[in-house]
UniProtKB/Swiss-Prot annotation:
Top-level taxon: Eukaryota
Protein name: NADH dehydrogenase [ubiquinone] 1 alpha subcomplex subunit 13
Localization per Swiss-Prot or TrEMBL: Mitochondrion inner membrane; Nucleus
Organism the protein comes from: Mus musculus
Biological processes per GO annotation: aerobic respiration; cellular response to interferon-beta; cellular response to retinoic acid; extrinsic apoptotic signaling pathway; mitochondrial respiratory chain complex I assembly; negative regulation of DNA-templated transcription; positive regulation of execution phase of apoptosis; positive regulation of protein catabolic process
Length: 144
């Protein structure tokens, strides 16, 4: 038996047509220059907004400071009234405690001067509860 002849595939007559091998990607978005320009514009806008906000913050800070300065004499007067009230109550308590001690002068200054010496918190709240002293030292606290 004779072997059959193998027929090899050949190109068509005249050859194959040209093959398009270049990438054909659609154009997407902005060009690099326009994206750079948009970025610079956003940066400039952000700096401008930040500058405006800093001016507003500075104006609000000055307003707060002026309000605090205006109210400072009132707060100082309230603090002085509270201090004098506590000292008066301490003098009354001292008179009760030291009534049996001879030659004891109630309210005599331990400093031998006529100048006003602001009392320390320990002196003011020495005859009061620990809770009142800790509130005076650290402010009012809700936690234990």
């Amino acid at each position: 038996m004779a072997a059959s002849k193998v027929k090899q595939d050949m190109p068509p007559p005249g050859g194959y047509g040209p093959i398009d091998y270049k990438r054909n990607l659609p154009r997407r978005g902005l060009s690099g220059y326009s994206m750079f320009a948009v970025g610079i514009g956003a940066l400039i806008f952000g700096y401008w907004r930040m500058m405006r906000w800093n001016q507003e913050r500075r104006r609000l800070l000055i307003e707060d400071l002026e309000a605090r300065i205006a109210l400072m004499p009132l707060f100082q007067a309230e603090k002085d009234r509270r201090t004098l009230q506590i000292l008066r109550e301490n003098l009354e308590e001292e008179a009760i405690i030291m009534k049996d001690v001879p030659n004891w002068k109630v309210g005599e200054s331990v400093f031998h001067t006529t100048r006003w010496v602001p009392p320390l918190i320990g002196e003011m709240y020495g005859l009061r509860t620990k809770e009142e002293m800790s509130n005076a030292n650290f402010g009012f606290t809700w936690y234990t």
